[in-house]
């Protein structure tokens, strides 16, 4: 690999090439949350639009882009460790470029290049669209380009995207967060919440469905707050905007499953629950972050709700959606957490009956109020409580899953999903409630089962973190997404919507069905 040159072909965009005249290859490595996964799809779309091609497996790419996370300390260590390993690779391949973006880049800024001088580009959460230009500038100037801006330049939706999946897609409803949780660094890195126009969101959903996608997940740091700060000044504040958006998704023909993440218990309202219950394609799944079952700790976290309020939400959801699967996030070892506080968390876990829980040991993040609290807990105390919580939650998970033995479930077949699938000869899929099911691909099958197809199976065995269905496939429905998966084709979405106060940029016309759905929201 040698230094790149830029070749301008007549009538074409500028294409990055190696000295040998080959188009440059890229790889995007993603750390962190679903937001980062979706941002990485935008990065891939940007790079391919600029002329790069995805690097084949088991090859050294000409460009490696890290989309980073800053929520936990081990994310920092993981990134800098990986960058250290790449130093020798880059020395052997002088034309190689390395770019670091995302939340950790937004946080560390110049520190990234100080710790890893062989990095070529550092960009933040607010200017991912600048990456191709920064890469060219770094190559031309033969020095690192660090560009971090303090506010969002444009919604990521005005950038092209190359999707990871042929059958399931992410769609952002907002960027940023207005909450001030004392443990969380995300608002300082992602900025204040700004909401997309409903019509733009639905246009993006329609564009995905038109390419075969059957499942969409609506993304936001706090989806319940959607509608409080539309970027379009012509749209009035609307606290029921999210429930209207869910109902509008129900009118899109061909969209079979809709999920969303993440809501906030303090702002979760009955109109959203009603929309979930009354809209057939909204999945009976809810991710509701608890963080702690102790009211004292919740107050210190600045979470704006208490355990009674949290449990009342779950009661209402289950009353209206009896088979809903509810998952959560829990932090163990927050500063000042006592044994009594921890027991309160265990009590809520036992009452809530979560299908699964993402449990974390508290990690102090510089720049957050909680990192400055004096009553930080010893590591061994946090570890011991974490292990006890895992035992309780795992037992709850298995008990809840046992209830499904003998039931028939519809699965959207997914790529991968089971580490032992090769050995067990099984495939994997997600039920409508989000549970992972490993199944035997035999029985009433219409040709080969592909990721993106739908099957129905009967649950024969339950484990804490997944279900098994070994009695054979009862029905198999082939899909356009399955056809696309079979040939390695994934959706691409063109720029949709408006920038922040900018003129409209390449927004496609909304399909008629989507236009009618939008009207009730706007």
Curated annotation (Swiss-Prot):
[4Fe-4S] cluster 1 binds at residues 33, 69, 103. Its cofactor is [4Fe-4S] cluster. Its EC number is 2.8.4.3. It is an enzyme of class 2 (transferase). [4Fe-4S] cluster 2 binds at residues 177, 181, 184. Keywords: 4Fe-4S, Cytoplasm, Iron, Iron-sulfur, Metal-binding, S-adenosyl-L-methionine, Transferase, tRNA processing. GO terms for molecular function: 4 iron, 4 sulfur cluster binding; metal ion binding; N6-isopentenyladenosine methylthiotransferase activity. This is tRNA-2-methylthio-N(6)-dimethylallyladenosine synthase. The lineage of its organism: Bacteria, Bacillati, Actinomycetota, Actinomycetes, Mycobacteriales.
């Amino acid at each position: 690999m040698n230094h790149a040159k830029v070749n301008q072909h007549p009538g074409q965009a500028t294409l990055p090439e190696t000295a040998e005249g080959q188009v440059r290859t890229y790889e995007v490595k993603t750390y962190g949350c679903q937001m980062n996964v979706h941002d990485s799809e935008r990065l891939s779309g940007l790079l391919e639009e600029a002329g790069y091609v995805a690097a084949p497996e088991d090859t050294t790419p000409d460009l490696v882009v890290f989309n980073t996370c800053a929520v936990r300390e081990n994310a920092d260590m993981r990134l800098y460790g990986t960058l250290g390993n790449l130093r020798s690779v880059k020395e052997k391949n002088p034309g190689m470029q390395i770019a670091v973006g995302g939340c950790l880049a937004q946080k560390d800024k110049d520190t990234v290049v100080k710790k890893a001088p062989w990095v070529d580009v550092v960009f933040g959460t607010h200017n991912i669209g600048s990456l191709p230009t920064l890469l060219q500038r770094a190559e031309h100037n033969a020095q690192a380009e660090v560009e971090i801006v303090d506010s969002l330049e444009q919604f990521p939706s005005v950038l092209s995207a190359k999707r990871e999946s042929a059958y399931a897609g992410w769609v952002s409803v907002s960027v940023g967060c207005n909450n001030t949780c004392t443990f969380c660094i995300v608002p300082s890195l992602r900025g204040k919440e700004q909401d997309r126009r409903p019509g733009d969101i639905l246009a993006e959903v329609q564009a995905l469905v038109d390419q075969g996608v059957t499942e969409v997940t609506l993304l936001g740091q706090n989806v319940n707050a959607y509608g409080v700060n539309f970027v379009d000044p012509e749209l009035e504040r609307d606290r029921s905007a999210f429930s209207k958006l869910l109902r509008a998704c129900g009118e899109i023909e061909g969209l079979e499953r809709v999920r969303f993440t993440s809501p906030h218990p303090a702002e979760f309202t009955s109109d959203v629950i009603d929309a979930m219950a009354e809209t057939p394609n909204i999945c009976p799944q809810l991710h509701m972050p608890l963080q702690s079952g102790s009211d004292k700790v919740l107050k210190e976290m600045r979470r704006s709700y208490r355990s009674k309020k949290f449990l009342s939400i779950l009661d209402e959801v289950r009353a209206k959606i009896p088979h809903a699967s509810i998952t959560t996030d829990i932090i163990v070892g927050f500063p000042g957490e006592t044994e009594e506080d921890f027991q309160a968390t265990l009590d809520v876990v036992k009452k809530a009956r979560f299908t699964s829980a993402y449990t974390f040991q508290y990690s102090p993040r510089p720049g957050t109020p909680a990192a400055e609290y004096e009553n930080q807990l010893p590591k061994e105390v946090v570890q011991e409580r974490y292990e006890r919580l895992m035992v309780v939650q795992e037992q709850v998970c298995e008990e809840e899953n046992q209830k499904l033995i003998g039931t028939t479930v519809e699965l959207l077949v997914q790529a991968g999903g089971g580490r032992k699938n090769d050995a067990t000869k099984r495939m994997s899929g997600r039920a409508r409630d989000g549970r992972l099911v490993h199944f035997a691909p035999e029985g009433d099958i219409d040709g080969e089962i592909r990721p993106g197809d739908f099957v129905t199976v009967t649950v024969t065995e339950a484990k804490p973190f997944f279900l098994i269905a070994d009695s054979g496939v009862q029905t198999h429905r082939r899909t356009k997404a399955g056809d696309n998966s079979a040939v390695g084709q994934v959706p691409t979405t063109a720029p949709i919507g408006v920038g922040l106060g900018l003129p409209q940029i390449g927004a496609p016309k909304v399909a008629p069905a989507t236009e009618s759905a939008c009207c009730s929201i706007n």
